[in-house]
Every structure is written in structure tokens, then in C-alpha cells.
A protein has these predicted regions:
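Alpha-helical transmembrane signal-anchor/signal-peptide segments
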Residues: 27-43
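Short nucleic-acid-contacting surface segments enriched for D/E, G, S/T with interspersed K/R
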Residues: 50, 69-75, 127-135
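Generic structural detector for well-ordered beta-strands
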Residues: 38-40, 78, 141
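Short, Lys/Arg- and Gly-enriched loop/turn segments at beta-strand edges
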Residues: 49, 63-73, 87-90, 149
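Hydrophobic membrane-insertion alpha-helices, especially the h-region
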Residues: 4-23
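Extracytoplasmic/periplasmic terminal helices and flexible tails
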Residues: 80, 86-92, 98-165
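Extracytoplasmic
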Residues: 34-36, 54-56, 72-74, 135-137
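Short extracytoplasmic
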Residues: 40-69
Length: 165
């Protein structure tokens, strides 16, 4: 019996590592091939002593498109982007399709009647808070399945804010 339990443990460990590596690969593909969309930030900036410096992100689009009682708790936010890649939600739907040529899909979830579109916090090095105070947009890379990754914060001129360190 011990022989089978060791084999079972090894097989499960290999599956776990395979799943982890696949997840990392998918995120790297989204960073490499995903479409950039900028979402305007609404003001929020609490600090956490336990976690270092961070900025809690509240997207203006999520605040202005408050869901009603009939909206599904999970689905897809359809965004239209302008020439500067700034996204605007045009509708919420529960399926990936239909999407027009000039539209982009981001997965959403609703918790306590609040719409979440992706990364809701941005961590930065201690002492860099003044650099990120000028952030106006959160930049997300989005794949064709609606998965999104926060790639950085952008200023009012649509430039990525980067630390000098």
C-alpha cells in the first residue's frame, strides 16, 4: 500500500506543478499578446502597514455602470476604446459573444452590488507613493477570452508611470 501512496503523491505533485506552469504560461501570453486598455481611476488611496505601500484601484467605469438586481454576478463587460486606448463600458453580457470589431471583452464579477473588472490594487516600493499619486489610468492587458492583467498605472498624458529604481 505504501508503494501506491508514494506513486499517488508523485502523480498529484506533477499535476499540480503542471497546472501552475500552465497558468504562468497563460498569463505570460496575455502580457505578450493582449490588447492594452486604459481604465480611468476614481479616487481611492488607503494604505496598509501590514502589506507595505499600495494603491487601491477603483475604476470610474465600474462605478458609473452600477449593476441592477437582474445583472448576473459574473459575466463580460464589453468596452469600446478610443484612439488613446481609454475604455468605456458599452454593455454587460453573460456570454463572450457577440462582440463587434471595435469592442473589447473583460470578465467582471459583482460583489455587494459593486462591479469588479480586474486587479483592484497596485503595490509599489516603499517611498514611491508620490510618483504614483499622478496616476489617472490603470493599464490592463486583455486577451480574447476576457482575462485581464494589470500592467501598470498611466498619467494624464497616457504614459506609463515607472520607478527610477
Amino acid at each position: 500500500m505504501k508503494k501506491y501512496s508514494r506513486i499517488l503523491i508523485i502523480v498529484n505533485l506533477i499535476q499540480l506543478l503542471g497546472y501552475f506552469n500552465w497558468s504562468v504560461y497563460q498569463k505570460e501570453q496575455t502580457l505578450k499578446d493582449g490588447q492594452l486598455v486604459l481604465l480611468q481611476l476614481a479616487p481611492v488611496d488607503p494604505r496598509s502597514l501590514m502589506q507595505g505601500d499600495y494603491m487601491r484601484l477603483n475604476y470610474k467605469e465600474a462605478s458609473s455602470n452600477l449593476p441592477d438586481e437582474q445583472t448576473d454576478t459574473r459575466g463580460y463587460a464589453i468596452l469600446r476604446t478610443d484612439s488613446n486606448q481609454v475604455g468605456e463600458i458599452v454593455r454587460l453580457q453573460n456570454t463572450l459573444e457577440p462582440v463587434n470589431d471595435n469592442e473589447l471583452v473583460i470578465r467582471y464579477k459583482i460583489i455587494n452590488r459593486r462591479l469588479f473588472l480586474g486587479a483592484e490594487s497596485f503595490f509599489f516600493e516603499e517611498g514611491q507613493d508620490t510618483l504614483y499619486q499622478k496616476a489617472v489610468y490603470g493599464g490592463l492587458k486583455v486577451d480574447d477570452k476576457g482575462q485581464s492583467l494589470l500592467v501598470g498605472l498611466y498619467d494624464e498624458d497616457f504614459h506609463l508611470i515607472q520607478s527610477d529604481k
